[in-house]
């Protein structure tokens, strides 16, 4: 039986991640691990991972799996673009789960006291991206307009250095 959801996503919490956002992080992800994508949405991240030879499966609140109440068995690490309205709660929960993770989050998150308080408790790494990610927005779709803010990969147990620089190359056609 699926757990009941406690959070109703806001209209801007359903932004889909284009495949190219994973290009910089993929070389650092362990192919021997089973990856869990807990905010799967339309499945862009999980699909991109599988297309690149990773074992990855996803769950989502829209299909009845509330990340804050549900934790599947058999996964080694998590990768997701969490709903930004819940970014601090999401970070707290993933730290509590005690496994490696990669979260695609706004760069400004690292400057917030709440995030810093959580991050002081674990070893973590960040991947700064040279360009902004143009997310597929729930209302506008992918209209080619520039992203509103820069994002980074916030990780624990993934990257070889505390700070890594990643290169985004925009494709001619995005997911």
Regions found by a protein language model. Name each.
Residues 1-175:
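Class I S-adenosyl-L-methionine-dependent methyltransferase catalytic core
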């Amino acid at each position: 039986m699926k757990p009941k959801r406690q959070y109703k996503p806001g209209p801007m919490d359903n932004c889909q991640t284009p495949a190219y956002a994973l290009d910089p992080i993929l070389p650092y992800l362990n192919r021997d691990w089973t990856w869990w994508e807990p905010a799967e949405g339309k499945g862009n991240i999980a699909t991109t991972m599988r297309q690149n030879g990773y074992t990855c499966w996803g769950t989502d609140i829209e299909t009845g799996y509330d990340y804050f109440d549900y934790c599947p068995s058999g996964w080694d690490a998590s990768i997701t673009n969490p709903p930004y309205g819940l970014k601090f709660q999401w970070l707290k929960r993933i730290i509590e789960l005690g496994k490696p993770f990669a979260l695609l989050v706004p760069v400004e998150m690292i400057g917030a006291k709440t995030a810093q308080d959580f991050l002081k408790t674990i070893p973590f790494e960040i991947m700064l991206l040279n360009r902004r990610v143009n997310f597929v927005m729930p209302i506008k779709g992918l209209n080619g307009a520039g992203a509103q803010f820069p994002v980074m990969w916030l990780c624990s147990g993934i990257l070889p250095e505390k700070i890594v620089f990643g290169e985004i190359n925009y494709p001619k056609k995005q997911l």
